[in-house]
Amino acid sequence: MNFFNYFRSQKKKSAQVAKERLQVIVARERVHRDGPDYLPRLQEEILNVIRKYVQVDEDAVSIQLERDGDCEVLELNVTLPEHKA
Protein backbone atom coordinates (compact mmCIF):
# COMPACT_ATOMS: atom_id res chain seq x y z
CA MET A 1 0.00 0.00 0.00
CA ASN A 2 2.87 2.42 0.74
CA PHE A 3 4.16 1.89 -2.78
CA PHE A 4 0.94 3.30 -4.29
CA ASN A 5 0.80 6.18 -1.82
CA TYR A 6 4.27 7.24 -2.92
CA PHE A 7 3.10 7.84 -6.49
CA ARG A 8 -0.11 9.54 -5.45
CA SER A 9 1.74 12.07 -3.32
CA GLN A 10 3.87 13.16 -6.29
CA LYS A 11 0.98 14.97 -7.96
CA LYS A 12 0.65 18.59 -7.01
CA LYS A 13 -2.69 19.64 -5.72
CA SER A 14 -4.52 22.23 -7.75
CA ALA A 15 -4.33 24.68 -4.85
CA GLN A 16 -0.53 24.45 -4.84
CA VAL A 17 -0.35 24.93 -8.61
CA ALA A 18 -2.69 27.92 -8.40
CA LYS A 19 -0.59 29.42 -5.60
CA GLU A 20 2.62 29.08 -7.63
CA ARG A 21 1.02 30.65 -10.70
CA LEU A 22 -0.35 33.52 -8.64
CA GLN A 23 3.09 34.15 -7.17
CA VAL A 24 4.55 34.42 -10.67
CA ILE A 25 1.81 36.84 -11.74
CA VAL A 26 2.25 39.00 -8.64
CA ALA A 27 6.03 39.10 -9.15
CA ARG A 28 5.60 40.23 -12.77
CA GLU A 29 3.10 42.89 -11.76
CA ARG A 30 5.51 44.27 -9.17
CA VAL A 31 8.23 44.57 -11.79
CA HIS A 32 5.94 46.36 -14.25
CA ARG A 33 4.31 48.52 -11.58
CA ASP A 34 7.63 50.07 -10.65
CA GLY A 35 8.34 51.00 -14.26
CA PRO A 36 7.63 54.48 -15.59
CA ASP A 37 4.28 55.17 -17.22
CA TYR A 38 5.82 56.52 -20.40
CA LEU A 39 7.42 53.25 -21.60
CA PRO A 40 4.43 51.94 -23.62
CA ARG A 41 3.99 55.32 -25.31
CA LEU A 42 7.74 55.58 -25.95
CA GLN A 43 7.74 52.14 -27.55
CA GLU A 44 4.80 53.10 -29.80
CA GLU A 45 6.46 56.35 -30.89
CA ILE A 46 9.78 54.64 -31.62
CA LEU A 47 7.95 52.02 -33.67
CA ASN A 48 6.20 54.76 -35.68
CA VAL A 49 9.52 56.49 -36.42
CA ILE A 50 11.11 53.21 -37.54
CA ARG A 51 8.11 52.49 -39.76
CA LYS A 52 8.76 55.71 -41.68
CA TYR A 53 11.88 54.04 -43.08
CA VAL A 54 11.41 50.27 -42.73
CA GLN A 55 8.39 47.96 -42.67
CA VAL A 56 8.47 46.18 -39.28
CA ASP A 57 5.99 44.25 -37.14
CA GLU A 58 4.49 45.38 -33.83
CA ASP A 59 6.80 43.10 -31.86
CA ALA A 60 9.93 44.39 -33.63
CA VAL A 61 10.65 46.88 -30.85
CA SER A 62 11.15 45.89 -27.24
CA ILE A 63 12.03 48.27 -24.44
CA GLN A 64 13.18 47.29 -20.98
CA LEU A 65 14.13 49.43 -18.02
CA GLU A 66 16.68 47.87 -15.71
CA ARG A 67 17.56 49.28 -12.31
CA ASP A 68 20.77 48.61 -10.46
CA GLY A 69 20.88 50.62 -7.26
CA ASP A 70 20.63 54.27 -8.22
CA CYS A 71 21.44 53.63 -11.89
CA GLU A 72 18.75 53.03 -14.54
CA VAL A 73 19.44 51.59 -17.98
CA LEU A 74 16.91 51.83 -20.79
CA GLU A 75 17.49 48.94 -23.20
CA LEU A 76 16.04 49.21 -26.69
CA ASN A 77 16.04 46.25 -29.09
CA VAL A 78 14.86 46.63 -32.67
CA THR A 79 14.57 43.64 -34.97
CA LEU A 80 14.97 44.83 -38.54
CA PRO A 81 14.07 42.72 -41.56
CA GLU A 82 16.87 41.31 -43.67
CA HIS A 83 17.87 43.55 -46.54
CA LYS A 84 17.93 41.64 -49.82
CA ALA A 85 20.73 42.82 -52.09
UniProtKB/Swiss-Prot annotation:
Pfam families: MinE. The keyword tRNA processing does not apply. It comes from the Bacteria. Gene3D superfamilies: Cell division topological specificity factor MinE (3.30.1070.10). GO terms for biological process: cell division; regulation of division septum assembly. The keyword Cell division applies. Keywords: Cell cycle, Cell division. NCBIfam families: minE (TIGR01215), PRK00296.1 (NF001422). Belongs to the MinE family. Prevents the cell division inhibition by proteins MinC and MinD at internal division sites while permitting inhibition at polar sites. This ensures cell division at the proper site by restricting the formation of a division septum at the midpoint of the long axis of the cell. This is Cell division topological specificity factor. The gene is minE.
